[in-house]
Design a protein with these regions (language model features):
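Acyl-donor-binding surface of acyltransferase catalytic domains
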Residues: 6-131
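Conserved GNAT acetyl-CoA-binding A-motif
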Residues: 59-62, 178, 207-219
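Conserved beta-strand-loop-alpha-helix junction that forms the acyl-donor binding cleft
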Residues: 216-227, 235, 243-247
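Active-site rim helix/loop that mediates acceptor-substrate recognition in acyltransferases
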Residues: 137-155
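A conserved beta-strand-loop-helix scaffold within acyl/acetyltransferase catalytic domains
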Residues: 149-155, 161-179, 184-187
Length: 250
């Protein structure tokens, strides 16, 4: 699905204030951040001091000009393949300290490698549109499926139901007009029945039909979630590091 990668490069170029050619080449790039139209608004801070992606074996930095210039001097020759390591996080924290910021998190992100759907046996499937999703606000069973954010609204969902009980929910948030992020919750009593894989693959296929790119993010250490992504037809495409104010991080 080469067209998906092309759309990814276009999206990352907007998010990181660079050219598509900068995403594709083999050099590290450092840009001053601007809030460009069409950017993903995933965990977006009011002011972006620094964020970094590792993609295609290289790095793209964007943020406040003074911070970016320090990063350029320190990381120009670093490999993207080995950058997302605790030792580099500590170096970034030292650079960010005077601004009152530090590394917040780093996640691997996945994009579709196929449009296949994995059926789930013995369950009822129900789909929800943006308006219908609102009934689940403040329902902590679905804290991964939905974010209820004005910046990245929840727009589509699919549930697995057994004996009139929702046992799994996958939701998609519109992080940008062309990239929707998928989240998933499954009742612990029903884990191991491939419900997560099925729901994520169904939502993936529905989003692709809208000519929008579904994507999936998780933690480095959440191996179960990474397995769900792989089984649902996703492959890892980039790693993203974001920063936040110290007072908000504790």
């Amino acid at each position: 699905m080469d067209y998906i990668k092309e759309k990814l490069y276009q999206q990352l170029a907007i998010d990181y204030c660079c050219q598509v050619s900068d995403i594709k080449d083999d050099k590290n790039h450092f840009t001053e951040y601007e809030k460009l139209k069409g950017r993903r608004q995933f965990e977006e801070a009011a002011d972006c001091v620094l964020k970094v992606i590792a993609v295609n074996g290289k790095l793209i930095f964007t943020g406040k000009k003074s911070i970016i210039e320090v990063c350029r001097k320190q990381f120009s020759n670093n490999s993207g393949n080995w950058f997302m390591d605790a030792s580099n996080f500590r170096k970034l924290d030292e650079i960010l300290m005077n601004e009152g910021y530090r590394v917040k998190t780093a996640h691997p992100f996945f994009i579709p490698k196929d449009d296949c759907v994995h059926e789930i046996n013995g369950v009822e499937i129900k789909k929800y549109n943006q308006e219908e999703i609102l009934q689940f606000k403040d329902d902590d069973r679905f804290d991964e499926a939905f974010c209820f954010s004005e910046e990245s609204p929840d727009v589509l969902a699919v549930a697995a139901i057994i004996d009139d009980e929702i046992v799994g929910m996958a939701g998609a948030s519109a992080d940008s007009p062309s990239f929707w992020q998928i989240g998933i919750n499954v009742n612990k009593n029903f884990e191991g029945r491939h419900i997560a894989t099925g729901l994520v693959s169904m939502l993936k296929a529905d989003i692709l039909k809208k000519e929008i790119v579904p994507y999936y993010g998780t933690s480095f250490s959440n191996l179960a979630s990474q397995h769900v992504a792989a089984k649902a037809g996703f492959e890892v495409a980039w790693v993203e590091l974001i920063t936040g104010r110290m007072e908000f991080l504790g």
